[in-house]
Amino acid sequence: MTINRKPIFRRVLLKLSGEALMGDEGFGIDPKVLDRMAQEIKELVELDVEVGLVIGGGNFLRGGSLAEAGMNRVVGDHMGMLATVMNGLAMRDALHRAFVNCRLMSAIPLHGMCDAYNWAEAISLLKTGRVVIFAAGTGNPFFTTDSAACLRGIEIEADTVIKATKVDGVYSDDPVKNPDATLYRHLSYNEIIEKELKVMDLAAFTLARDHNMPLSVFNMNKSGALKRVIMGEEEGTLISSQASDEVIK
């Protein structure tokens, strides 16, 4: 296997789930997980990779779950947006403590806490090596943070949207329930649909496919996995327009 000495991606959009930040806490944020992710992001910055970041809010609440309990969906989603801002504030602090310059931008105005999202300014910040955290989703209800990640990735012209998960990539079946499930190294957009594989919600996936935005899926709990994805090593699953049947037993 040939290992690239330079990153294969120049600019990336990293999507972290809110649940992943819980770690062993069960609710909220596990400081150890937060600091570890900040260090892994720092490694990318030191490789001159430009990093945009979207974090979910599921470690605090989910608008969809509140709607199922009877709350107005718009209100629930607004609360979910605020949860992503809380995670963004925490990550900004963790990155600053790791001596990484970053900026937090929110899709909804929150003067005094973070900047309002501005596409041109975000591009300028990325070019100067700052990490840009995009909070509050798309700023609209009924859209997931996966959709926000794909949207921001397309807007900032990222080379790939990297989704951090709790498993090693995209499997033929749920690896937790089925130990015989196979791990795919590379899939096309069409193969994802044909095999009915769950990567992200359909709106987000369709947005990425229609704009030919490659998707990378990796295990955020595996130390060094993010860097290996960036370096083009065999890690996780890459989803693009190119078809491949390669699987790892």
Curated annotation (Swiss-Prot):
Signal peptide: none
Annotated metabolic or biological route of this protein: Pyrimidine metabolism; CTP biosynthesis via de novo pathway; UDP from UMP (UMPK route): step 1/1
Activity regulation, free text: Allosterically activated by GTP. Inhibited by UTP.
Alphabetically ordered keywords of this record: Allosteric enzyme, ATP-binding, Cytoplasm, Kinase, Nucleotide-binding, Pyrimidine biosynthesis, Transferase
Pfam families: AA_kinase
Enzyme Commission no: 2.7.4.22
GO biological process per UniProt: 'de novo' CTP biosynthetic process; UDP biosynthetic process
Cell compartment(s), UniProt: Cytoplasm
Assembly and binders: Homohexamer.
NCBIfam families attached to this UniProt entry: pyrH_bact
Function: Catalyzes the reversible phosphorylation of UMP to UDP.
This protein's name: Uridylate kinase
Classification lineage: Bacteria, Pseudomonadati, Pseudomonadota, Gammaproteobacteria, Alteromonadales
